């Protein structure tokens, strides 16, 4: 199927096609910790952590290993198999990278979780060092298409992000990379992003839907409706194929009663336990959803 043909498919047809491609996939749950908050000089217009916007976000330096382990233990209790260390800012200092490496070692010794990290722009030698200390997967979103990127960020480029993904692939780390939707882009932008992620051979693609945050330039943006969200997920599954994990992440609670439909439309993973600066769904609600999905999808 030609990529452009996907855009013209009826929603039901697209969902059914995506659903057939997820039949052999397992449910993949992950959780993250906001390990360093605020203090970011980048201008990503959707993000609460940019110091350029007055969002009231908490600001703190890199957490200690005991605090991060506590969050990891909570994630493990919720059934997560992966745990991500996420820091604000374009990149970490060498000193901070050394500290994160020690934290990764500590988590691997005290949990059964696979450890992921999202630390901004890193070079190959830095990523290799983290891998040698136990890092399993690196996360770095491309966010949107190259042509639309300057509408959401001007302090770095789309290709800065691509380079980091390539660096992680080159040192044989697994890679998680996705985007944010509902920031003014169209379906052509989404399709182009999906194609680029496929060509980069990433392992996991998080699908984030904009949660407008007061104080950011996008605070008055309207949230995407459920049908457009479902079409986006299904389109990514059809483009990416059967072997890539697609996770619904930020904004998934806005699906309301239709959240399970995202999994029939191609998703096979989600972030549990909240996001960087916002709470997600409650633990009890997520457990009910997970149990229902496992029964319905035989996960």
UniProtKB/Swiss-Prot annotation:
A GO biological-process term: biotin biosynthetic process
Note on how the cofactor is bound: Binds 1 [4Fe-4S] cluster. The cluster is coordinated with 3 cysteines and an exchangeable S-adenosyl-L-methionine.
Subunit annotation: Homodimer.
GO molecular function: 2 iron, 2 sulfur cluster binding; 4 iron, 4 sulfur cluster binding; biotin synthase activity; iron ion binding
Cofactor: [4Fe-4S] cluster; [2Fe-2S] cluster
Binding-site positions, [4Fe-4S] cluster: 40, 44, 47
HAMAP family the UniProt entry points to: BioB
PANTHER family, sorted: BIOTIN SYNTHASE, BIOTIN SYNTHASE, MITOCHONDRIAL
Enzyme Commission number(s): 2.8.1.6
Similarity annotation: Belongs to the radical SAM superfamily. Biotin synthase family.
SUPFAM superfamilies attached to this UniProt entry: Radical SAM enzymes
Biological role: Catalyzes the conversion of dethiobiotin (DTB) to biotin by the insertion of a sulfur atom into dethiobiotin via a radical-based mechanism.
Residues bound to [2Fe-2S] cluster: 116, 176, 247
Pathway(s): Cofactor biosynthesis; biotin biosynthesis; biotin from 7,8-diaminononanoate: step 2/2
Lineage top rank: taxon: Bacteria
Annotated catalysed reactions: (4R,5S)-dethiobiotin + (sulfur carrier)-SH + 2 reduced [2Fe-2S]-[ferredoxin] + 2 S-adenosyl-L-methionine = (sulfur carrier)-H + biotin + 2 5'-deoxyadenosine + 2 L-methionine + 2 oxidized [2Fe-2S]-[ferredoxin]
Keywords noted in UniProt: 2Fe-2S, 4Fe-4S, Biotin biosynthesis, Iron, Iron-sulfur, Metal-binding, S-adenosyl-L-methionine, Transferase
InterPro entries: Aldolase_TIM (IPR013785), BATS_dom (IPR010722), Biotin_synth/BioAB (IPR002684), Biotin_synthase (IPR024177), Elp3/MiaA/NifB-like_rSAM (IPR006638), rSAM (IPR007197)
EC top class, as a word: transferase
Protein's UniProt name: Biotin synthase
Keyword Nucleus appears in the UniProt entry: no
Domain Radical SAM core: start-end pairs: 22-252
